[in-house]
């Protein structure tokens, strides 16, 4: 297992010592491809170093969009490997950067909000996550086609947070919306099944296993 950055990781656009203040874009596509390679090998240490390196490069290059992309990837990585303080720092940095970029109505902003909310939710901060999901929902519903699969994923994640907060009616409404979207996706059957299982969990949390037995069984049969 290679624990060090290879030349391929850093040979493209690099702003040495910030001597060139003009904006130069970091190679986002290659960065994500290399990240996926490290994750496919469960080489999380290399993945962390990879993202830290390119975060520094984006800052040196004044590439704020590239920096936001790297921060979003850091949120996902640190959430995956359970590094709470690092994840929450990336969440804070991503939200601050996005707020400074005049992109409030863009899908990029909406996606950043969802990633940040998911990061909060992963570390038992559902209260902090919910307002971010609400803002993202407004953006996604305005910018995306009503059958776009990204909406289904957002509805599901937001509903999980609502369930954790005991807001069951709104959560169930979003689960039903998620099902309608995911039923129209190619190979969406798995996501639909997962959503029915989530509804069963909601009923169990709301009514208890005994009182909700029949309704839970119904959802499990749908799944």
Language-model features and meaning:
Residues 20-22, 60-63, 100-104, 142-146, ...:
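Short coil/turn linkers that connect adjacent helices within long alpha-helical scaffolds
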Residues 55-57, 95-100, 137-142, 179-184, ...:
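Amphipathic alpha-helical segments of tetratricopeptide repeats
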Residues 44, 64, 84, 126, ...:
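TPR-repeat structural position
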């Amino acid at each position: 297992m290679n624990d060090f950055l290879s030349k391929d990781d850093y040979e493209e656009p690099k702003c040495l010592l910030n001597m060139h203040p003009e904006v130069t874009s970091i190679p986002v596509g290659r960065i994500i491809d290399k990240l996926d390679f490290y994750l496919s090998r469960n080489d999380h240490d290399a993945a962390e170093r990879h993202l830290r390196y390119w975060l520094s490069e984006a800052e040196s290059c004044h590439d704020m969009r590239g920096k936001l992309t790297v921060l979003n990837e850091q949120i996902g990585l640190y959430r995956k490997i359970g590094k709470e303080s690092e994840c929450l720092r990336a969440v804070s940095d991503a939200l601050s950067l996005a707020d400074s970029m005049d992109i409030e109505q863009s899908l990029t902003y909406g996606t950043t909000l969802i990633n940040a909310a998911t990061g909060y939710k992963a570390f038992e901060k559902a209260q902090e996550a919910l307002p971010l999901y609400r803002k993202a929902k407004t953006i996604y519903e305005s910018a995306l086609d009503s059958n776009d699969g990204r909406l289904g994923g957002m509805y599901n994640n937001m509903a999980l947070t609502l369930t954790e907060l005991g807001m069951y009616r709104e959560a169930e409404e979003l689960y039903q919306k998620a099902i309608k979207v995911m039923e129209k996706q190619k190979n969406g059957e798995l996501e639909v099944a997962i959503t029915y299982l989530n509804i069963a969990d909601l009923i169990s949390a709301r009514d208890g296993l005994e009182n909700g037995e029949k309704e839970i069984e119904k959802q499990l049969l749908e799944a």
